[in-house]
Amino acid sequence: MKGPSKTTKNNTKIKLKKGDLVQVISGSDKTKTGEIIAIIYKTNKVIVKGINLKVKHKKPQQEGETGEIIKFEAPIHTSNVMLFSEQNNIASRSSVIINDKGQKIRKLKKTGELIK
């Protein structure tokens, strides 16, 4: 087995990859950009660095221990993020092209910029 399936429960393929630069297009963090840290294929969500921060209060477990406040990135649905071009400051959908060697390369539709 190769690893986790790239499709979700409803068989939609996630076109984003770990390390992609994305912009949030809806919600409280709208227009913020960040890098994808993780992809959760089962729920069709991504975790973006520094975006959708949530706070968790942890109680002390033992006597003499202090409680703490933990900040963490919560997952965002893939429909709420879009690939982002840093050169042109534009969010865009992606398409796949096949080069001369037969390799698949992702490309931004609005700018034509190739994605690594």
Curated annotation (Swiss-Prot):
Query: Quick one: which gene encodes this?
Result: rpl24
- BP GO terms, sorted: translation
Family matches, as PANTHER family: MITOCHONDRIAL RIBOSOMAL PROTEIN L24 (PTHR12903)
Q: Which Pfam families match?
A: KOW, ribosomal_L24
- Identify the HAMAP family for this entry: Ribosomal_uL24_B (MF_01326_B)
Q: Name one GO cellular component term.
A: chloroplast
Protein's job:
One of two assembly initiator proteins, it binds directly to the 5'-end of the 23S rRNA, where it nucleates assembly of the 50S subunit.
The text of the family note is:
Belongs to the universal ribosomal protein uL24 family.
Any one GO molecular function term = structural constituent of ribosome
Q: How does it assemble?
A: Part of the 50S ribosomal subunit.
Keywords of this protein's UniProt record, alphabetized?
Chloroplast, Plastid, Ribonucleoprotein, Ribosomal protein, RNA-binding, rRNA-binding
Task: Report the locations given in the UniProt record.
Answer: Plastid, Chloroplast
Q: What is this protein identified as?
A: Large ribosomal subunit protein uL24c
Stored NCBIfam families: rplX_bact (TIGR01079)
